[in-house]
Amino acid sequence: MQHRWLAGIAIALAGAWAGVSAASAQSWPSKPVRIVVPVTAGSATDVSARVIADHLAPLLGQPVVVENRTGAGGTTGMGYVAKSVEPDGYTVLVHSAAFVIQPATFPNLGYDSGKDFAGVTLIGNAPLVMIASPNKYKTLQELVTAAKAKPNTVNYATVGYGAAAHLTSERLRLAAGFEAQQIPFRGAPEAVNEVLAQRVDFFFSPTLAAVPLIRDGKLSALAVSSSKRALSLPEVPTTVEAGYPNSDYNFWIGMWVPLKTPRDVVDRLYAETRKVLDMPAVQEKLIALGSEPARMTPAEFDKFFQAEIKLNGDLVKAAGIKPNP
């Protein structure tokens, strides 16, 4: 008799939870949705989030507001979403591939990128182009040959220790087997100017900053870092095509929510975001920012970013990059 009573309670609870789950997707959102961007306003990641927010709001029937929570290399905003908000679908994170770099470069964070977030979707790939002065190098092979002939005489620009340009350069350096010195700068414009002035040998730059100078003949495009050629530079080979296996490094932008966000809410957010990303007007704006269309389901994106966390962790160790304290 007691077993029947317990079984009845279990069935009732299961039904209740199922009802709550179904209701959550139907009622969500009933108030404004906030997209947290952990980098500064005006960056490609920030502008991408704002483009999506503008088109997502009508589909959800609620305002979608972008909030910049910057600091500590993006970890302030990530920590806020991971630990300080309710996992109810009303706070969303949009961030770049820095999301998967930080577990290796900031090991003492109060959150875990791999365990505290659920993926929604990949927003787009953002290839980096390896630029150099045409007075010094016109091909990647020329640069590698020069670097091997005189070890540690070649240098490269980054926009911060452990940032994407740093890891991209190190992945190529390890794959091609040469030595080079890193020189950090405050941002991409400064790094590009140093390459133009021939004080720096190469820099993996966002395509948006480099393409006009490449078209004017002021910079050489030696290769792109991504697995596929960039839409804006279809004539430029990838580093792998240039002859260096396992040298590709993909930079991208994605969307996450706190881990315990109801699955049906995640699925609804993905479905509506997918509609936005499929809009020609949105694709045109994102491509202009250097972000090429890419799509992944939540399950695919979860698998993808977990693999990227491991790849970057292994790369940081292989390159001898010391984590931040």
Give the ranges of each region predicted by the language model.
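Short secondary-structure boundary segments
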Residues: S96-A97, P134, T207-L208, S226-S227, ...
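Hinge/capping helix and adjacent helix->loop/strand transition within the periplasmic-binding protein
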Residues: K83-Y90, A104-E190, T239-E241, W252-K285
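An extracytoplasmic/periplasmic, membrane-proximal ligand-sensing/linker region
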Residues: S30-P32, A175-A176, E241, R263-P325
